[in-house]
Structure formats: C-alpha cells, structure tokens
Amino acid sequence: MLAAVQRTDRKFSLTYRAAIQPNPLFQFLCASVIVFLSVGPGFAQSGASYTAQRRIDTITVDGNLNEASWFNALSTSVLTLWNGSPAPAALQTTAKLVWDDQYLFIGFNAQDSDVYATYGGRDPNCWEQDVFEVFVTVPGTTGYIEVECSPKGVIWDGYFTNVFQGLGGSYNLASLQVAGHVNGTLNNPTDSDLGFSGEIRLPFSDIYQGVSGGHPTNGTQLRLNLNRINWNTPATPGGLGAAGSDTYYAWSPVPGASVSFHRPANFGTVTFTTNSVPAPTWQFTGQTLADTNLVFSGSGHPGGTYWVLVATNASLAMASWT
C-alpha cells in the first residue's frame, strides 16, 4: 500500500510505513463557504464552471484531504483576485468537490507564508482573519447559505433569503462539518508557513431546503463560488489582521465598484455527474526500494508541488510517476 505526500521542495525521501493508503496531503487554506439557495426568479448565470464527481471512499472531515476520493478528483482553476486579476504566486488557492446522496464535500488548499487565525467558538467574525468561503445557490432561487471555515476549523454559517437579507449568523446548519489543517505555525509572522487546507461537508438538506428534489442527480447544477480572504498576523495577535494586509480571492470573479462576494449573478456553475472519481493507480517497476532514506528528484506539478509516493515494504519498486 502507498501514501502520497505533497511537498514544495525539489527532493524528498522515501520511507516505509505500515498500513497506509493513498494519501495526497493538500496545502490548503480554510475559508468560508457560502451556499446559495433560492425560491423566486433566481439570479442570472455567468462565471466559472466545474464538474463534481461522486466520492469513492468514506471522507473523514479532518482538514487533511487524505482519502482516495480527493486524489483524482478534478481541481478547480486557481482562484484569482476578486476582480479577476491573477493571484500572487505565493497565495495560490485551489479546491476540489465530490458528492454523495447526502452531502457536498469541498476540499481546498491555500498557500500562505503567514497563517493567521485566533478565533474560537461558533460564528465569530472569521472574515477578520484568514478564511475560506464557498457560495452556492439552487438555480431559480434567491436564498443562500454562507459557511466560513478558518484554518483552525472554526465555523461561521448563516442563511440569507436574498443578498444580505435573512437570518445571517443566527442560523446554524445542524449537519455541517468543517475542519482545517495548518501546514506551519499559526499566528507567527517571524517564520514561513506553507499554508493551510480544509474540508467542508455541506448537507444537501440545507442547500435544497424548500426546494423539491433533496439532492442532485446526473446533470443537476448548482450555482457556487469559492472565496478566500487573506490577512497577515498583526503585531499583537488577536482580532482583526494586520491593517491594510487583507486581500480577497474568488474562483468565479465578482467585479464591482468594491469588494463583495455576495454577487450571485457572478457565481460559477457546478454540474453533478454520477460518474465516480477514478481510483488512484500506481506503477512500480525497476529500482527496488531497499533504503529507508533514498533521496531522488521528482517531476513538478502545476503550482510547484508534486507527490511523494511512499512504499510500505521493500518488495515494491518504483521507476517513475506522473
């Protein structure tokens, strides 16, 4: 059996492990998720597009994205600045979406050299610190749910009957699960982090509340956006991030006179397919792994990351990978 570990350096070590499975560790950022629901004339459609496949194994929401479902799931394009301008190379953000009959799963990876998050509890002002967001709406409706996830896995969630109208943060999704994982140290601007990742399990019962159907079928579409707010750690951690350090990113750009992610007309479109995510496959030929500290170079992936494959016993051998 094998594990896969994401790295950003150009060399890595192979080690043996017992009882491991395909395990891509994404460097992900936690942010907030906004899901759009509606019952009315609906919002005009434009923006990015994505095809969500069905999961192939049980997803434990712990922020690590170490299930086989995540390994070969389609990746979104890199989030841009909110107005569509390219994001800085050091702040790249991507996400993957998979689903089953009950839940939409969203996994994300955010590069960040200074991860900042101090808030705890339920429904703090997560947008004042590093956070990941998702916006989703049922086509033909006008309501939406907003869920925010911090790098610590702290949740802010709310329901809106229309843009900025409704229950806001007083509404809690009963079956929502969110988790974050920091690849570095929180709230320490003196070192250099790699970023943070996160997983969100969003129940279709909340997305489709008041709408017939209950969950997607093959070809069903939802309107959705994925957003990130980045802050640097202030001199005294706690509360709002460092003044003037905030930047805003969106999968489907939301241009306007000022920053606002609450522009459903600019959301992207997610189309659901009943096709499952392809199972991970591995090819082992040639050199036998006989050393627990064998170092060699690997080929790069987009964004400067690549996967380290780890064999569980020396009888397996690897020649190359992609």
Region roles according to the model:
Residues 1-25:
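N-terminal secretory signal peptides that target proteins for export/translocation
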Residues 13-18, 30, 34, 69:
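Extended rod-forming repeat segments used as scaffolds/tethers
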Residues 24-39:
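Bacterial N-terminal signal peptides
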Residues 40-44:
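Sec/Tat signal peptide C-region and signal peptidase I cleavage site
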